Amino acid sequence: MATIKQAFKKRIWECSEKYKPTYQISYMENKDIMETEFTVNAASTAQNELQDFWNDFCKDNGLKKNSVVAVVCVG
């Protein structure tokens, strides 16, 4: 498991989309792998935007920030 920043450093993601890409975040919650999606403004700003979205998502859902399993660009 990792944070969004760690996932980007490890390149636990794939992306061919360049305009407003959508990323699927897989994460651990109560021993289950769950998924959510976020759309960012550009691939070049994806890491920072995803980090902000993820922080808010974790706060709203009572999750640990380092529960990320994978980050995949899905469109």
Task: State where each predicted segment sits.
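Short stretches within intrinsically disordered, low-complexity N-terminal or propeptide regions
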Residues: 4, 9, 44-48, 72
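Hydrophobic beta-strand residues in large extracellular and virion-surface proteins
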Residues: 23-27, 38-40, 50, 68-71
